[in-house]
């Protein structure tokens, strides 16, 4: 038997409408997976603008800021990432809006999961 490890790639997007100013989990990297986060798109549909904080929490519960109180202009979608972000198994992307019922967030990622194939 010959064992080979190949990578299964799956594209996903996660969306949230921030209806409160509480911190909300947007995405958790699944077990045995690495995620390449290509985009975090934020928009404010209130006509007034708002702020957003986006963090990554690792498996040791350490919190890292991706965007801190970033101002999002009214009716102008804003791309948060300038480069892809690699996140590992169990890491969590969380978001919090400064104002409720104004902000929408869309995260787009490619999940990479190793898979063993027997031939």
Language-model features: locations:
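C-terminal interaction-tip segments
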Residues: 7-35, 39, 96-119
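A generic structural signal for short beta-strands and their flanking turns/coil linkers
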Residues: 36-38, 50-52, 89-91
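Beta-strand signatures of extracellular beta-sandwich domains
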Residues: 53-57, 106-108
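Short edge-strand/loop segments of extracellular domains
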Residues: 57-61, 112-114
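Intrinsically disordered, low-complexity Pro/Gly/Ser/Thr-rich segments with frequent PxxP/GP/PP motifs
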Residues: 59-92
């Amino acid at each position: 038997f010959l064992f080979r490890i190949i990578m299964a790639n799956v594209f996903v997007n996660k969306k949230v409408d921030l209806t409160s100013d509480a911190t909300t989990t947007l995405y958790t990297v699944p077990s045995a997976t690495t995620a390449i986060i290509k985009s975090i798109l934020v928009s404010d549909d209130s006509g007034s603008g708002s702020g957003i904080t986006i963090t990554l929490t690792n498996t040791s519960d350490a919190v890292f800021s991706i965007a801190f109180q970033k101002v999002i202009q009214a009716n102008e979608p804003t791309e948060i990432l300038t480069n892809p972000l690699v996140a590992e198994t169990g890491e969590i992307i969380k978001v919090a809006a400064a104002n409720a019922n104004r902000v929408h967030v869309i995260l787009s990622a490619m999940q990479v999961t190793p898979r063993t194939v027997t031939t």
